[in-house]
């Protein structure tokens, strides 16, 4: 905590010094018509130490089936993305190691289960990149294609997205329980249409309030579907009344928020470099609270500390209820609810681990930034990742 405070104070003083220097230099040049001042120092901010915040969560390392499942999933994904993605974009996908996130977040599943999670994540990331380049109207069309493919066995519009999703449904989805399958499809419907809403907001240049953003982001993250996958792979078919239990939902929402808040912190530089930073919690916090970038990052870090406490308290409450429960059916439901929360905890921690292994957020400096937590901003609108590049 002391080191974090010292680092934060140092960067605040540095920013103030840069501002004063810029003003003094500008006044001198205006009066004396001398050579222009040198370029300003790059803007930096310090990431919250989420690894420390999440150190109470389970850490089972990397799934031992990673290499085999990854090779299979990449070969499967390549069959569909080559028609849509150019050579540079295909290489970008490879360097992002999207399959690796599932090996950190589902360390307990067998090879077939891991392969299912990898295929699903390749679909999610593919949809995310495609809709990042689309208008709100086109993004809604992509959402409809995805949902119809998941729900309608005979639907096929010939697109790569449709055929990829159809293949996933036939290969994996049929093995999940009825309650889990129903929730998965409902969550997919909401998530993909929420992604289209995000595209509409980007078109209009609209930044939501903190409350409005958190509500939308819970859906655009797609994390609900990943939680459904966790239940399915642990052979859990949670009854709806247990799923709706207020205590369980407190733990569920806390885990959900922790995943996308970490993602927003780590992806901020990449998104602002593309000009897409309107859909990021740091932008939202800065706009509503008038905080600077560093203070906004600190604000989110404190929020994560509150949420991890909420998550742990919910889990403990359910464990106490289980210890007193005499009804076998209710006890079984409570046991599955607790197991589900443990699975979500793997997701929260594994997401952070993966974020510093992939080059998606920090490029070749990922290991350096993991150690220092100092992010240097890339110039805004300097990155253009075209799908066909």
Swiss-Prot record:
EC number(s) per entry = 4.2.3.88
Q: Which GO terms describe its molecular function?
A: metal ion binding; terpene synthase activity
Which coenzyme or cofactor does it need?
A: Mg(2+)
State the name under which the record lists this protein.
viridiflorene synthase Agr2
Its UniProt domain note says: The DDXXD motif is important for the catalytic activity, presumably through binding to Mg(2+).
Residues bound to Mg(2+) 3 = 263, 267, 271
Residues binding (2E,6E)-farnesyl diphosphate = 360-361
User: What are the disulfide bonds?
Assistant: none
Q: Which residues are recorded as binding Mg(2+) 1?
A: 128
The record's annotation in PANTHER family points to:
BETA-PINACENE SYNTHASE-RELATED, TERPENE SYNTHASE
Top-level taxon: Eukaryota
Alphabetical list of InterPro entries matching this protein:
Isoprenoid_synthase_dom_sf, Terpene_cyclase-like_2
Q: What is the lineage of its organism?
A: Eukaryota, Fungi, Dikarya, Basidiomycota, Agaricomycotina
Gene for this chain? Agr2
Signal peptide limits: 1-15
Q: Where is this motif: DDXXD motif?
A: 128-132
- Role description: Terpene cyclase that catalyzes the cyclization of farnesyl diphosphate (FPP) to viridiflorene.
Q: Name the UniProt key words of this record, in alphabetical order.
A: Lyase, Magnesium, Metal-binding, Signal
Single Gene Ontology BP annotation: isoprenoid biosynthetic process
Catalytic activity, per the record?
(2E,6E)-farnesyl diphosphate = viridiflorene + diphosphate
Protein family (similarity comment): Belongs to the terpene synthase family.
Positions annotated to bind Mg(2+) 2: 128
């Amino acid at each position: 905590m002391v080191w974090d405070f010292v680092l934060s104070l140092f960067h605040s003083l540095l920013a103030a010094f840069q501002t004063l220097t810029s003003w003094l230099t500008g006044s001198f040049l205006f009066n004396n018509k001398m050579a222009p001042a040198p370029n300003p120092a790059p803007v930096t901010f310090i990431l919250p130490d989420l690894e420390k915040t999440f150190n109470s969560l389970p850490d089972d390392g990397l799934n031992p089936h990673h290499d085999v499942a990854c090779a299979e999933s990449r070969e499967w994904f390549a069959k569909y993305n080559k028609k849509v993605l150019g050579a540079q974009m295909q290489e970008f996908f490879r360097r992002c190691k999207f399959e690796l996130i599932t090996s950190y977040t589902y360390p307990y599943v067998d090879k077939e289960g891991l392969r299912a999670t990898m295929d699903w994540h390749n679909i999610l990331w593919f949809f995310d990149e495609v809709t990042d380049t689309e208008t709100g109207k086109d993004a809604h069309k992509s959402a409809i294609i995805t949902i119809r493919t998941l729900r309608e066995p005979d639907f096929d519009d010939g697109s790569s997205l449709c055929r990829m999703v159809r293949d996933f449904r036939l290969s994996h989805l049929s093995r999940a329980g009825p309650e889990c399958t129903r929730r998965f499809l409902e969550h997919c419907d909401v998530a993909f249409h929420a992604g289209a809403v995000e595209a509409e907001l980007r078109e209009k240049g609209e930044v939501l309030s903190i409350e409005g953003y958190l509500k939308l982001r819970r859906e655009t993250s797609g994390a609900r579907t990943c939680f459904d996958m966790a239940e399915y792979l642990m052979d859990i078919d949670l009854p709806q009344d247990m799923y709706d239990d207020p205590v369980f939902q407190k733990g569920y929402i806390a885990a959900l928020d922790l995943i996308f808040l970490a993602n927003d912190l780590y992806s901020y530089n990449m998104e602002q470099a593309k000009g897409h930073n309107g859909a990021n919690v740091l932008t939202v916090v800065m706009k509503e609270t008038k905080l600077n970038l560093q203070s906004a990052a600190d604000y989110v870090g404190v929020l994560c500390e509150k949420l991890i406490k909420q998550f742990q308290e919910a889990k403990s409450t359910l464990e106490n209820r289980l210890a007193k429960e005499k009804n076998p059916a209710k006890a079984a439901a409570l046991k599955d609810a607790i197991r589900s929360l443990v699975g979500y905890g793997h997701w929260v921690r594994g997401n952070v681990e993966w974020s510093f292994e992939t080059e998606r957020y920090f490029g070749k400096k990922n290991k350096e930034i993991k150690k220092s937590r100092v992010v240097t901003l890339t110039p805004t609108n300097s990155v253009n990742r075209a799908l066909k590049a």
